[in-house]
């Protein structure tokens, strides 16, 4: 295999074009093989193989800095930069990351995971390069979905102004995770249509030149005038950025030729490359949304694998039903229709649904505008992405106490996506915001109760739930819930475990049937149930949460006890002050000591040794 001979990008420069083409197919096979075992971002990486090979053929990594926005498309990059022997560990605990990571390889120019960051990073690098008198190339590879993000557009504005030498490669596959939305995406599609027209034009030009040179001259002058107008309306020219394209992102020879030419140019240049998401794997080409990030599968007989009924689906089903009951309900999402379980809702209530693209801040402030005019908006968003709209949560929603509901998906440890995606900071940054209430349901039925009640209580409410399966709740059932009140699930005589969110099941498992240990579903963090907390202060208390210990649920409990002048023995279980890498969720919980075994050990340290500990 040719891949066996490739240990660094330098080895690509010694291969013939024919060998590079064969290497592209070998890389695709390896990506399919490993993602079939481990899961991962399959379709994006398959679509970028030729582009990655061309970039490493022309540029000199790691001296030249090649940045991959988000990192979904970087698997080929990992394979040709000295990590092929570890590629089988992709996204596994102790293995290589599914994204680019500075600490993993000198060839990874940035640590990525969130969208739209590459251009600002690249701008910083070219500024540093020029100020330090160094000479290297900076190339930012960004998808058409990520380019719609406000951070990317703001960086383009500054890149055009400063006119520093850098190359932006727009990898246009018409997708992010869901289908792309917005005016810029429509423009990219129009450019692709124009490319088809240009190809037809070339054929007509050859025929016309032979038939009538005079007529050809007239048509050619008209074409030049049209080209001028096209450039005038091209947004990249308006930014002061040279635009080249669109070009075929799977024409390896053509890509190498174009990149060699662009490498010599001064100022900022954008190369528009059109690729096919899932290229070379029929099922991924046919359904790039599902195969964007599939779980494990059989590569010889690839079929969609049911992930079971998830919290995301439970949320989607609940809001779909609620929208039939509440005509003012409106749901927004930042490019996560499928991930947030909103396909059904978007089909049944298209007029009250908005995908704003990868613009979390826009989602939150648009929700504020809706609320100001009498609507009841719900922002469906992952915990890790809500942090990108923190200012809007405070400035646009909370200050005026607007009735916006934040449905926070993927709260807590999320597994194989690692440090950039764990939702373990939202409690800390949200509970400091006045007016904002925070809750976490124990099951899908309680989620339904909280969503319905949240639309009635007034003011902003955050409801957080994990990346996990959950038992389906019956349709049409909307139980009442005592807002702000906790729920005792098991009585105890010596100690109580106060569990918030997903850790409740660990608490019940740890307590078992031991009569000394009680368990509380502490489902409301803000407001805390101070009445119950006062009653429980006669016992030893152990708080448990799938969140950073600092500033989390346990901290809120201690603050409340202090304000009430109560001093029971309290221990807090949560994530320690460090970033957790990728791995299986149960394993990461075990590392953090918030699983059932960790709870039993903490209780034993408090003098309540359970049967498990005594044995």
From Swiss-Prot:
Record has Hydrolase as a keyword: no
EC number: 2.2.1.7
Binding site for thiamine diphosphate: 72, 113-115, 145-146, 173, 281, 360
InterPro entries referenced in this protein's UniProt entry, alphabetically: Dxylulose-5-P_synthase (IPR005477), THDP-binding (IPR029061), Transketo_C/PFOR_II (IPR009014), Transketolase-like_Pyr-bd (IPR005475), Transketolase_BS (IPR020826), Transketolase_C (IPR033248)
SUPFAM superfamilies per UniProt: Thiamin diphosphate-binding fold (THDP-binding) (SSF52518), TK C-terminal domain-like (SSF52922)
Binding site for Mg(2+): 144, 173
Subunit (UniProt): Homodimer.
Family from the record: Belongs to the transketolase family. DXPS subfamily.
Protein name: 1-deoxy-D-xylulose-5-phosphate synthase
Top-level taxonomy: Bacteria, Thermotogati, Deinococcota, Deinococci, Thermales
């Amino acid at each position: 295999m040719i891949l066996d001979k490739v240990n660094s990008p330098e080895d690509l420069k010694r291969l013939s074009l024919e060998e590079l083409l064969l290497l592209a197919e070998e890389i695709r096979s390896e990506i399919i093989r490993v993602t079939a075992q481990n899961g991962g971002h399959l379709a994006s990486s398959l679509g970028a193989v030729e582009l990655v090979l061309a970039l490493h053929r022309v540029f000199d990594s790691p001296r030249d800095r090649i940045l991959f926005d988000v990192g979904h498309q970087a698997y080929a990059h990992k394979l040709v930069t000295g990590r092929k022997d570890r590629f089988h560990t992709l996204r596994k605990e102790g293995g290589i990351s599914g994204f680019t990571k500075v600490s993993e390889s000198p060839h990874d120019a940035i640590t990525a995971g969130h969208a739209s960051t590459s251009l600002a990073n690249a701008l910083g690098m070219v500024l540093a390069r020029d100020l330090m008198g160094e000479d290297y190339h900076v190339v930012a590879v960004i998808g058409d979905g990520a380019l719609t993000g406000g951070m990317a557009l703001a960086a383009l504005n500054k890149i055009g102004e400063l006119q520093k030498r850098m190359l932006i490669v727009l990898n246009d596959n018409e997708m992010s995770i869901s289908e792309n939305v917005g005016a810029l995406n429509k423009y990219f599609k129009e450019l692709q249509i124009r490319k088809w027209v240009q190809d037809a034009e070339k054929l007509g030009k050859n025929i016309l030149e032979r038939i009538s040179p005079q007529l050809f001259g007239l048509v050619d002058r008209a074409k030049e005038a049209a080209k001028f107008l096209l450039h005038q309306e091209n947004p990249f020219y308006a930014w002061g950025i040279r635009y080249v394209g669109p070009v075929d992102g799977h024409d390896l020879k053509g890509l190498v030729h174009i990149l060699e030419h662009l490498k010599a140019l001064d100022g900022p240049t954008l190369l528009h490359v059109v690729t096919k998401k899932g290229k070379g794997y029929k099922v991924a080409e046919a359904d790039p949304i599902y195969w964007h990030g599939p779980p494990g599968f059989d590569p010889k007989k690839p079929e969609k694998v049911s992930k079971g009924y998830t919290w995301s689906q439970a949320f989607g089903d609940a809001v779909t039903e609620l929208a039939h009951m509440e005509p003012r309900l409106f749901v927004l999402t930042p490019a996560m229709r499928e991930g947030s379980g909103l396909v059904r809702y978007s089909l049944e209530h298209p007029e009250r649904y908005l995908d704003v693209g990868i613009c979390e801040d826009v989602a939150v402030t648009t929700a504020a505008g809706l609320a100001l005019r009498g609507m009841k908006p719900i922002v469906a968003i992952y915990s890790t992405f809500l942090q990108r709209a923190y200012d809007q949560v405070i400035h646009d929603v909370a200050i005026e106490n607007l009735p916006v509901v934040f449905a926070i998906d993927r709260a807590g440890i999320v597994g194989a996506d690692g440090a950039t995606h764990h939702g373990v900071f939202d409690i800390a940054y949200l509970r400091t915001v006045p007016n904002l209430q925070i809750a976490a349901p124990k099951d899908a039925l309680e989620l339904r109760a909280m969503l319905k009640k949240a639309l009635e209580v007034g003011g902003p409410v955050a409801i957080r739930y994990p990346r996990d399966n959950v038992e389906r709740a019956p349709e049409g059932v909307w139980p009442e819930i005592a807002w702000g009140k906790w729920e005792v699930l098991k009585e105890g005589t010596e100690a109580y475990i106060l569990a918030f969110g997903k850790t409740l099941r660990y608490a019940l498992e740890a307590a078992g049937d031991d009569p000394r240990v009680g368990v509380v579903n502490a489902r409301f963090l803000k407001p805390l149930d101070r009445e119950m907390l006062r009653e429980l202060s006669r016992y030893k208390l152990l708080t448990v949460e799938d969140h950073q210990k600092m500033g989390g649920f346990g901290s809120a409990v201690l603050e409340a006890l202090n304000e009430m002048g109560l001093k029971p023995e309290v221990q807090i279980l949560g994530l320690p002050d460090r970033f957790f890498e990728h791995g299986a969720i149960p394993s990461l919980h075990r590392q953090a000591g918030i699983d059932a075994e960790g709870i039993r050990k903490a209780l034993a340290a408090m003098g309540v040794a359970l049967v498990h500990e005594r044995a």
